């Protein structure tokens, strides 16, 4: 299993993405909701993989909820970068491929557009359990 790294601009939130997939094979999705479009989100995840979200400063993790309020959108409070989103008490995560160190391998590929406006909260959670990666949060002291 390979480990890939990424972070927000200031480095307070970083990602270790463990997957058997090489970046050229990462599934790419573009949610068409206003929030994701405004943040140029390029979603990726691997249900067989795992993501460790490392908090260099736990105060830097800003959680934002809207719409069905079942998802925490993870934004760095210091630099404003949207790194991903979690559901079910941080059990599942999707990451923003644009924050990964290997993002150049993702750009230029066609992402699957997703319109999810008609999903109920229960349907969203079920879909995310199937598509998103397992998540663990590691809060480290300075």
Regions inferred by a protein language model and the residue ranges of each:
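A short Gly-Trp-Pro
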Residues: 1-7, 12-142
């Amino acid at each position: 299993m390979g480990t890939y790294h990424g972070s927000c601009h200031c480095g307070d939130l970083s990602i270790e993405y463990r997957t058997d997939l090489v970046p050229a094979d990462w599934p790419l999705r573009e949610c068409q909701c206003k929030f994701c479009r405004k943040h140029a989100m390029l979603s990726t995840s691997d249900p067989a993989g795992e993501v460790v979200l490392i908090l260099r400063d736990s105060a830097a993790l800003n959680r934002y909820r809207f719409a069905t309020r079942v998802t925490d959108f993870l934004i760095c409070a210091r630099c404003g970068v949207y790194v991903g989103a979690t559901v079910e008490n941080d059990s599942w995560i999707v990451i923003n491929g644009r924050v990964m160190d290997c993002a150049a391998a993702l750009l230029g590929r066609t992402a699957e557009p997703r319109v999810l406006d008609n999903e109920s909260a229960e349907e969203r959670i079920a879909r995310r359990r199937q598509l998103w990666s397992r998540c663990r949060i590691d809060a480290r002291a300075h």
